[in-house]
From Swiss-Prot:
Protein name: Integration host factor subunit beta
GO molecular function, one term: DNA binding
Stored PANTHER family: DNA-BINDING PROTEIN HU, INTEGRATION HOST FACTOR SUBUNIT BETA
Pfam families documented for this protein: Bac_DNA_binding (PF00216)
SMART domains noted in UniProt: BHL
Encoding gene, per UniProt annotation: ihfB
Family of the protein in this entry: Belongs to the bacterial histone-like protein family.
GO CC term, one of those recorded: cytosol
Keywords: DNA recombination, DNA-binding, Transcription, Transcription regulation, Translation regulation
UniProt organism field: Rhodopseudomonas palustris (strain BisB5)
Length: 101
């Protein structure tokens, strides 16, 4: 599913909202998550999961074509850990679509 499909599904389930408004809301949520991660904050959505940033140190890499050693700079990468409710829902028996609500 891509973002435009997500927006469309949410708009379909909420006919009182315009699709443009749903798109603005989804974009605002994603922007806030990215901004928080850029500040070094952790973003936890209970039942869904938690977003955080992991820092990878500089290291020596290797060019797979030539075999030459190349330096790889340190970098920060986004990390997502699923929440308990999501893991349980994903690991249910096939055919069981009960959402627990």
């Amino acid at each position: 599913m891509i973002k435009s499909e997500l927006v469309q599904r949410i708009a379909e389930h909420n006919p009182h909202l315009y699709q443009r408004d749903v798109e603005n809301i989804v974009n605002a949520i994603l922007d806030e998550i990215v901004d928080a991660l850029a500040r070094g904050d952790r973003v936890e959505l209970r039942g869904f999961g938690a977003f955080s940033v992991k820092h990878r140190p500089a290291r020596a890499g290797r060019n797979p074509r030539t075999g030459a050693h190349v330096p790889v700079d340190q970098k920060s990468v986004p990390f997502f850990k699923t929440g308990k409710e999501m893991r349980e829902r994903l690991n249910r028996e096939p055919g069981n679509t009960d959402t627990g609500a």
